[in-house]
Amino acid sequence: MTEVPRSGSGLPRRAGEIAAAVLGVTLIGCALAATERWCDRHFLPSFFLPRRGYVLILIVVRVAMAALGVWLAFVARPRVGRLVARTPARAVHIAIAGVLAIGASEAVLRSMRLRPAEWLMPDEEPRRQPDAQLGWTFVPARAGHADVGGRAIEYAFDSAGYRVRRVDEPVDPDRPTILCIGESVMFGEGLTWEESVPAQLGGMMGIQSANLAVHGYSTDQEYLRLQAELPHFRRPVAVVSLFMTALFGRNLDDDRPHLGPGLRWLPPQSHARLASLAKLLVPYRRSETVERGVAMTREVLRAIADRSRERGATPLIVVPQLGREEAGERIVRRRVLDEAQLPYVLVEIDDAWRLPWDRHPNARAAHVIAAAITARLHSAADARGQTAPVSSMRQKGPPR
């Protein structure tokens, strides 16, 4: 006896097949569209993952998407249709369970106290504390210790929160001073105070340096930090700001205090926790977001130079390039700096000159960076204080 199909089973079956086919074709289309050029446009250079890592991940994901798409569209489509036709209620239950799981995950994450992506570990040395204007700063007047590459590193801070040799040797704001702003590279992550760029720069120039850098800062946070601290110094000689193309993505984040058009201060933006987690794992950027980041970064770097000149200090942007400059990094550098006619010194560093088990520059690399800055500042002084023209200095080894 032939089994008579249940009334209405044909429509759910066709709907299931169509859904599987559409999803499969979509996955195949995405796999074809996700080229290296697309990747370079929407995934910015990363300090922690070289481009070749991104490309390898992209290849694996494209192959997986294409294979899954073909399987859904041409192999599993009839099975999906039959499954939906036999148990349409189960498909609805699965969809409801998925929605409830997402909602529950979001609720759990919202119950946790989360920090911006650049400050996830509260007990990490050097210790940070919340700051309503800047997002976070270092805890002042203390010394902390960390083991980096098998070395015990001391991070000491004076009462102003600047990194110093010893807590009882604070920066003197009345002396001629070179102010250094930036993030962990300028700060000297994994380096002793003597090995850090600001300390070596001060020694080469014979002028006191002030290390105002803070871990995880973006370019606009650097500017806000300078804006708050520059008035405290009576005789600023130079302001050296660090810009790394591999860290440009930070300038696009808004989960911290940030600057909008016209350098307008904006509070942190709250996002869905799951969306923030997905963005951390898959840092996709829309083209419009990148364009806004380029414009904001140019405006901030100009403002840093203007504030420095107003106080009689020479502004200089240092651009350390660890390893060979990839095409994506070159595009960011040219768009942010060259097209805006901003003065900077490009310092190419051997990719091997990094800390063990860490991607931060080692003491040898810090020496090269400090030497390049010193040469440019001497050149500016010889020009009677006039700003040096836009160009780059490629230096691959310590000066002899």
PLM segments and residue spans:
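Cytosolic-side transmembrane helix boundary signature
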Residues: 60-95
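Generic structural signal for small/hydrophobic residues in well-ordered secondary structure
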Residues: 183, 222, 238-239, 308, ...
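Transmembrane alpha-helices and immediately adjacent membrane-cytoplasm interface residues
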Residues: 92-116
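Conserved SGNH/GDSL esterase-like catalytic core that processes O-acyl groups on lipids
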Residues: 187-262
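Serine-dependent acyl-ester chemistry module
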Residues: 13, 18, 25-51, 55, ...
